[in-house]
Amino acid sequence: MSAALRPVPRPGVLAIEAYVPGKSAAPAGVKLHKLSSNETPLGPSPAAVAAMRETASHLELYPDGSAAALRRAIAGKYGLDPARIVCGAGSDELLSLLTYAFMGPGDEGIYSEYGFLVYRIAILAAGGTPVVAPERDHTADVDAILAAVTPRTRIVYLANPNNPTGTYLPFDEVRRLHAGLPGDVLLVLDAAYAEYVRRNDYAAGLELVAESENVVMTRTFSKAYGLAALRIGWMVAPPAVADAVNRIRGPFNLGSPAIAAGAAAVADDAHIAAAVAHNEEWLPKVTRALTEIGLSVTPSVGNFVLIHFPDAPGRGAAEADAFLTARGLILRRVAAYGLPHALRMTIGSAEANEAVIAALRAFVKDHPDA
């Protein structure tokens, strides 16, 4: 009989660093501009809100466990087979389910140096070993990833574009990565920010999924679609991979309001176009303005920028964060990603963007080079 006085988690669980979301509060009496979680300033599609409200009179009913209406809507938009689509409570859930289905103790999962923190959490939760591939210029390095592959590798995770850096790999490089992987290694393309990318050499990965047995693409409704509160994600996968995930997925992991809102949002092309147009206007404006102030900004194709600060007393990211927070401007510290001297800023409303630019201009002026 065990001598423990209370239930004890299995070995390794308490060693996992819990994910800490971006801050969402400002000092009392100060107008809040939350730019810490890459949420769209345009909000959700009115059609999605209306569809969600229509479900409110039937909350006693279980949702459709297969999310068929949402899968059909997604399939229609992208020309996919609905049977190869799995929906989840955000793409985070799907990333975790993929890991639990294909990884266990003794296995390894590879992700790039500044990749999404959820990959590490999911790998450790599955009993696997995280393997970090170094990046080059804050961008995933295909050669470094391939060099990290061993007979124990089960999954390679690639956020493309990457969060928090905003960098991306051209599709030719993604193809080269896939070509270099053994057939029994699953390549997971996390395309959470794909809607925002306007580069001729970028592709989210649908074509590669269609022609491969070991590639999955995940997407989310939390960013460009403005439905973060409803937690809606989806993935498209080879039939065998989708089947494995469905076997361990919760039976009602997506509620009726989320299913209805997601299906309506997919059909509202004009709303997505407006969100992308806003980002196309403000991403270069913010980048240029911050650079003119004297700050270094990693070139981004997402709806956010990574701003670098000097490693110097009084002038660093922590001090800048405190300065901004006192003015109601909430950015994201990214020290947990190994970037202690940087802040990530969501491209927000015109008012919010201008406020951050003005505040950082004042911060840099008040904290000049020594």
From Swiss-Prot:
The modification N6-(pyridoxal phosphate)lysine is found at residue 223. Its cofactor is pyridoxal 5'-phosphate. Gene3D superfamilies: Aspartate Aminotransferase, domain 1 (3.90.1150.10), Type I PLP-dependent aspartate aminotransferase-like (Major domain) (3.40.640.10). Keywords: Amino-acid biosynthesis, Aminotransferase, Histidine biosynthesis, Pyridoxal phosphate, Transferase. It holds the Pfam family Aminotran_1_2. Pathway: Amino-acid biosynthesis; L-histidine biosynthesis; L-histidine from 5-phospho-alpha-D-ribose 1-diphosphate: step 7/9. One of its GO terms (molecular function) is histidinol-phosphate transaminase activity. It catalyses: L-histidinol phosphate + 2-oxoglutarate = 3-(imidazol-4-yl)-2-oxopropyl phosphate + L-glutamate. Homodimer. Belongs to the class-II pyridoxal-phosphate-dependent aminotransferase family. Histidinol-phosphate aminotransferase subfamily. This is Histidinol-phosphate aminotransferase. It comes from Methylobacterium sp. (strain 4-46). The lineage of its organism: Bacteria, Pseudomonadati, Pseudomonadota, Alphaproteobacteria, Hyphomicrobiales.
